């Protein structure tokens, strides 16, 4: 989870069935190494909070030549699938940009407390930021945070398994049980961070395979992926924002319908009163 500035690589995504996942990992087992960040808590989770503006600056970029996302990444660990995941001391803020399968990141890593301060100061400088890694990424991220109306809009949560191969030039991740949530505040190290039912907006695909690599795919990987179609248009950010929008519409629609019904009733009452008055004013009408 080290800081990376302007790293450029290729990224492919696949939305898979359980059988496809089983077959894929059986095929690559001897070529890739499992990443474990905490031996005592080997089950890893990722919580990602996406930022956007009131006019959907970042969401609109998903439909252009360069898709941009500003996001906060927090990591949680658990001893087993039954245990509650707790927040780790590692967190990062990053600007991710995609053009086709090519992607680049400007990322800074720091404690959740320090990143909270960076976000709240909206790009203003502070001596405390000197400890961030790498410091060269700070101006770019401060510039993004200074955009008017920038604010957290969506949080995603999923369990992640990661593997590396080809001397680190290839990274494979499997995200399971993707969940879209209302935006969450930055957590406290050691706190339980699994989303509660009140914060959950919708569920995403059950299994998402992501391949990040520099250069061409190795032959063994190409063989393992045979018969699997890349999900070219898939985006956690885009799907999650659409889910948030649908949720808001579902909440607003009954309120708007009730307001319209009240307005119609008021107009009917006013029309009835006006009609009585007009009729009574006609000479000879009794």
Language-model segment annotations:
Residues 1-286:
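Phosphate-end processing signature that detects enzymes handling 5′-triphosphorylated RNA
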């Amino acid at each position: 989870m080290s800081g990376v500035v302007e790293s450029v690589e290729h990224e492919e995504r696949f939305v898979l069935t359980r059988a496809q996942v089983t077959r894929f990992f059986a095929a690559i087992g001897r070529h890739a190494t499992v990443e474990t960040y905490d031996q005592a808590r080997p089950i890893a989770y990722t919580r990602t909070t996406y930022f956007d503006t009131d006019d959907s600056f970042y969401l609109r970029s998903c439909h252009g030549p360069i898709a941009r996302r500003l996001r906060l990444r927090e990591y949680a660990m658990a001893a087993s699938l039954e245990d509650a995941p707790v927040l780790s001391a590692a967190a990062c803020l990053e600007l991710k940009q995609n053009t086709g399968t090519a992607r680049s990141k400007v990322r800074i890593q720091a404690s959740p407390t320090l990143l909270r301060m960076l976000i709240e100061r909206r790009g203003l400088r502070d001596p405390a930021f000197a400890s961030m890694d790498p410091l060269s990424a700070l101006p770019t991220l401060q510039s993004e945070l200074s955009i008017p109306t920038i604010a957290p809009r969506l949080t995603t949560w999923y369990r992640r398994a990661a593997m590396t191969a080809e001397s680190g030039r290839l990274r494979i991740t499997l995200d399971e049980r993707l969940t879209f949530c209302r935006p969450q505040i930055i957590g406290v190290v050691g706190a339980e961070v699994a989303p509660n039912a009140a914060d959950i907006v919708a569920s995403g695909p059950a299994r998402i395979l992501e391949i990040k690599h520099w250069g061409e795919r190795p032959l063994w990987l190409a063989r393992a992926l045979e018969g699997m179609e890349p999900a070219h248009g898939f985006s956690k950010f885009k799907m999650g924002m659409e889910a948030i929008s649908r949720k808001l519409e579902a909440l607003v629609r009954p309120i708007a319908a009730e307001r319209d019904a009240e307005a119609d009733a008021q107009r009917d009452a006013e029309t009835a009163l006006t009609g009585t008055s007009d009729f009574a004013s006609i000479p000879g009408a009794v």
